[in-house]
Amino acid sequence: MNDRPAEETTIGEAAPAEIAEARPAHIGEPAPAEIAEARPAQIGEPASAAARPDLLADRLPYRIARPYRVRFEEATANESMRTAIYLAWAADIAWQHSTELGFGREWYAERGLFWLVRAIQLDVLRPIPTYAGMLVSTQVLGYRRVAARRESDVRDPSGELAARLLIDWVMTNERGIPTRVPADFLKFVAADTPAIEMHKVALPAAPRDAFERRFHVRRRDLDPLDHVNNSVYVDFLEEALEGAGQGDLLRATPRRYALDFAASAARGESLTGRAWPQDGGWAYRLSREDGTEVFRARVCRL
C-alpha cells in the first residue's frame, strides 16, 4: 500500500477534487448506501414519538439500523464503552449495509476494489454503560469522484442520540490507487446531494515537551488485511492522552475526535506517538521511526 503525502486541509475545509495517492487506511469493508444532509450532533438529542420509528427502522436502500450490545471486554474501568468500539460498530454496519445492497466481499474481490477509511469525525455525546443495548444506523451522505462519506448514529432504544460519526472513505484498486466510484452506486444517491468536503487534520510540529510514547505494533492490533485496524489507532491516541494526564478529557461528554489516517502501520513496526495541548484540546501525531506520519488526531470538549 502506498503512503500518501500529508495534505494541509483541516476538518471542514475543501479537499482537492481528487486524491493524488492512496490513503492506506484500515477497514477493507465497503462503504455506501443512503443520503441525508450532514447535521451537527446535538447533545442528548431526543427523538420525538413520531420520529422514533423512522430513526430506528431501516429505510432501504438508503439506510439500515442494527442492534449492538456493549460487551464486558469492550468497556473501560469506569464502566463505559471504549471509544474505539464506536469505530468498530460503524465499520461493521457499513459492511452489512453494502452486502444487503448486493455489494458483498465477493463483488469487491472480483473487481479488485476496496474501501479504505480516510478520516473520521466522532462526537461522543454521552457515555454508554457496560452491557447496554444500542441501535447503530448507517447511510451515505454523498460521493466525490473517488470517495464517499457515511454517517452513523448510535442511539439508545428510545431513539436518544449518544454518538455520531462522519466517516470519509476512499475507493482504491488492488494496487492501492484511488479509483472512481462505480456508477452502480450512484443510484443510491439523491440528485440534490451536496458536495462533500473531505475531512483533514493539519497539525503543527510537536513541541519539545510533548508527551512521547514509543511502542511496537502487536499481533492483536492487526486486522484481516494484516495492518493496524483503524479503531486501534483510537486506543493508541487515548493511551497517550491518559499518559499525559488527560483522563478527565477522555471521560468528558460531549467531546469530539477528529481522526486522520495518513498511512497504514504494519505488523511489528516501531511507532512513536506524541501528544500535546492545542487550541483548548489535545493534538496527537503517530509516526514511524523515519518520521513518516501514520495518524493525526485532535480531541476536544464540545
Region annotations inferred by a language model:
Residues 2-5, 44-117, 164-166, 172-255:
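Hot-dog-fold acyl-thioester-processing enzymes
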Residues 11-47:
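Long, intrinsically disordered low-complexity tandem-repeat segments
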Residues 241-276:
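Charge-rich, low-complexity terminal tails
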Residues 112-127, 252-264:
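Small beta-barrel nucleic-acid-binding modules, principally OB-folds
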Residues 2-4, 44-48, 53-55, 60-66, ...:
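HotDog/MaoC-like acyl-thioester-processing domains
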